[in-house]
């Protein structure tokens, strides 16, 4: 799993170009088939790193009635977001329950999924307080400050011990 995540992080930026579209990113309107009705759903179809802000409106195929937005955490401060049309849905959005705070600290690799059937309903992800996310990301670096202090104190004690002998 770690090897797959490493390969994704290293190789993904090299292969991505605007001309290199996956089958899900291609516009179904470009196909030869024109006998489909007008009741197909419109969704955003795109992938981004570390943000839910991507737009690429596409009309889904008639066999794909759902818009999906999914986020997968690869490293503690690195996640991939995919928006696409889908034939099935693992989790349907129900009437909004009480608002809950969105946490990025959970040790789960898959941390957000939303399915819906309304035009462009997969535009926005969960409400993330960017300052809280940055504080969480910065706390990793702050914990290393104690390590440098310990190393400095160790070197000072060694130097003091050598000067006494």
From Swiss-Prot:
Membrane topology: Lipid-anchor; GPI-anchor
Entry function: Required for sperm migration into the oviduct and male fertility by controlling binding of sperm to zona pellucida. May play a role in cell growth.
Covalent lipid sites (GPI-anchor amidated glycine): 138
Residues carrying a glycan: 20
Domain UPAR/Ly6: 47-141
Name under which the protein is recorded: Lymphocyte antigen 6K
Keywords: Cell membrane, Cytoplasm, Cytoplasmic vesicle, Glycoprotein, GPI-anchor, Lipoprotein, Membrane, Secreted, Signal
Propeptide residue interval(s): 139-165
Tissue expression as described in the entry: Specifically expressed in testis (at protein level).
UniProt KW Cytoplasm keyword: yes
Any Gene Ontology biological process: binding of sperm to zona pellucida
UniProt keyword annotation of Disulfide bond present: no
Subcellular localization: Secreted; Cytoplasm; Cell membrane; Cytoplasmic vesicle, Secretory vesicle, Acrosome
SS bond list: none
Range of residues in the leader sequence: 1-17
Subunit details: Interacts with TEX101.
Domain of life according to the entry: Eukaryota
Gene3D superfamilies: CD59 (2.10.60.10)
GO CC annotation: acrosomal vesicle; extracellular region; membrane raft; plasma membrane; side of membrane
Alphabetized InterPro entries for the sequence: Snake_toxin-like_sf, Sperm-ZP_regulatory, Toxin/TOLIP
